[in-house]
């Protein structure tokens, strides 16, 4: 039996609508997820792997230094008055070197290398890096704080050593060019032959102090970031490639061959999260994105804040802070003991960096108000000083990231050292950094063409197919049954009587009605 033409058209249109439903809402999402799982894994064939190994554009690395405008008064115990100088802008190029794949457990090992170039044009107006800044002497304070914590009986000898190494300093402050303390380095004189300076310098060589580089003639050069510049980091990091399971991509599983740290307590020693340069796809808003910082030896777990967009791509914004170790059970294990945590918003970096420093949010944002009251000149603002990531949830791509951390030090107060006996003992800021990532137009367009344009086309096409297919099916069915529908419509409004031929012959006009008498008209 051959179908009527109208039903054929209806069947074809219905098939189009059904295909739109199946392809648009079932097949395409499945194909997309399958393809993304392949593309987002760190296999040698993917673009993600190439970009993960060497970011093809520079990150923004900004440094803000706190200049102590009343150093002489602070030496006598006064409240520091600070003036922020910056940003000093550096172009930061990141790459991973000595990369090795391990097929047996789906991991990669690598080391990091960062290269910094000073960019005066992007720095604050007038800053050249040659400005003299006045800050607490990081190296001198570091020596005193470390000995006071670990070997307090040795403080007297350290005092003599500092007088020899630093030529009888008048106070605990450093007056130095900005670029010297940041990258170029300042000379630490270890050529003295007296016992105390010589013994101290020998210990420095043996322990390998962070930021210290041995120079000829028994000299050291000290800077904050100089040892990182164009230097291969000695730590070997192991992460998951995500080929077996894309949700594990970038997950840190070991550092220097060890699957756990030994510097904290309990679960804080675990490696949780990715290495911060790649994240898994398909992460819902209800879940946190986790990354492990090898610089700070801890995991950060930003939480969802709001919907955002970047260059036409919808993103989710996640934010984070240092945390409150005393009152957050998940973070308490970062304290040496449960009841000896630093104030809210501070993290003791000594176990990680081997230097007596504290990390916080810039300007003590989200920190104990008491910290802010100990200094003048700080103005915390979440827009300028917060940590945030604009994250594309389908691919797991960080579109915009702003990592902001402030480094602080304690003005040690002790009667065993003349230079330290009148200090306040408070924790004060030294500088803060703003490391920023923003995908440029080239990579945003690449992401759009590979993912979002096809996704939008399919999104429009599926609705077109369902809408017009359904409409075509309805029209075809209506046309096929139009005569029957019309008869039904007529029968509902008109009564029809069946008349036989015999009845027709017997009918006359009277059946219809009797004749009426003409109306009379009076003339």
UniProtKB/Swiss-Prot annotation:
Membrane side Cytoplasmic: residue ranges: 1-11, 480-523
Molecular function as annotated in GO: scavenger receptor activity
Extracellular face of the membrane: 33-458
Disulfide-linked positions: 268-333, 297-352, 335-341
Annotated keywords: Cell membrane, Disulfide bond, Glycoprotein, Membrane, Olfaction, Receptor, Sensory transduction, Transmembrane, Transmembrane helix
Chief site of localization: membrane
Coiled coil region boundaries: none
InterPro entries for the chain: CD36_fam
Protein name: Sensory neuron membrane protein 1
Native source organism of the sequence: Helicoverpa armigera
